[in-house]
Amino acid sequence: MATFYASKTGEVSAREKEHSALVRELAGECMTLLENDGTLPLAGAGKVAVYGNGVRHTVKGGTGSGDVNTRTVVTIEQGLKEAGFEILTGKWLDEYDKVLADAQAAYQAELAKKAEELHIPIFAVMFSEAFAQPDVPAITEKEDTDTAIYVLSRNSGEGADRYNRACDYLLGENELADIAYLAEHYEKTVLILNIANLVDTT
């Protein structure tokens, strides 16, 4: 009879708890601080304006075998809230959720159409037709805080799914404008690169 070493129940095992604690400890050591003008660390929990495509849709790993199954994924939004921060930009984040959902629905419809035309599975079309991430909404108002955080996310997998275009290797038009807006209107601005690949920030 074969021996199974994986968990056999839905309970969180002691091994998982131990490994989760280790991952939490190591995560900070795996992040790189590229530049700091005294903004970090933030003085303490308080009101923050948080923008960017990675706030709620945080990238935890690449696609394909670069992605692993986990019980939970803590987004940057969740992490900030659990740390006691009050996020003032829920309306903007909701707006981006809709933009992303609409783009994903259009992508799935296009995949289905091409799969039918070519008489191949939808999965096969995905290898040649990577999802084009939509640009973010424009930021037009300053929130009642001196601190803004912008989370720029990019994801990719094992195939030819990166392109030298806006909202991919390059920043989108609104991404560039939004980051410039935050730098101009907030005393403290933090840019987080939540990326599983290269991105041109020049």
What are these regions (language model features)?
Residues M1-T202:
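C-terminal non-catalytic regions of proteins with extracellular/luminal or membrane-system context
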